[in-house]
Amino acid sequence: MATTAPVSDEYAAPRDRLVLANALALIVPAALLAGAYGSQIWGGLYPCEMCWWQRYAHFAAIPLALLAFVLPGRRRALVLMAALAIAVSGAIGGYHAGVEAGVFEGITTCTSTATGATNADLLKAILAAPMVRCDQVQWALWGISMAGWNAIVSLSAAGVIAWLSLKRR
């Protein structure tokens, strides 16, 4: 007769929760970046300056989460740093959604990252680049812009990741 392990009312062991938090800290920013790049490449939705800021925070979270898998002795600290980066992206997304709604004033300058070209090449690139304003919604689902969705998903995920990482029992 086969025996089964006793069913426990407890949630997963702390180590298992930390591994789950680690996985979420990797999957959430990767999925959000995939969605952002997918909408850019296939949907023609080019990012504004604040969209890039949100992406940079997710770019920071991914290597932290990967490093946490490689260094299990430092996992909790690395996962919490990844959660912080995800929360920063969410906070920027919340601010960006507020700019889109007219609640906050947006940035007033635009920047260019072009280097190593002649003045004529730079002018040609500037004129060919799509002009994307931070205060205009390019796409929305149920009245919530992409920046708003990033805020909702990122802040929620950061909270869950932090809770899973810090919960001892």
Kindly give the residue locations of the regions a language model identified.
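Short, Lys/Arg-rich, polar N-terminal cytosolic tail immediately upstream
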Residues: 1-18
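Non-cytosolic membrane-interface motifs at loop->transmembrane helix junctions
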Residues: 45-55, 108-111
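Extracytosolic (periplasmic/ER-lumenal) interhelical loops and adjacent juxtamembrane/interface segments
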Residues: 101-147
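C-terminal TM-helix exit segments that contain a strictly Trp-centered aromatic cap at the helix terminus
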Residues: 31-40, 88-103, 120
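Membrane-interface loop-to-helix entry segments
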Residues: 50-60, 142-155
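Immediate flanking context of iron-sulfur cluster ligation sites
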Residues: 29-46, 65-68, 125
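Interfacial segments of alpha-helical transmembrane regions
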Residues: 15-27, 67-90, 159-160
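Membrane-interface capping segments at transmembrane-helix boundaries
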Residues: 163-169
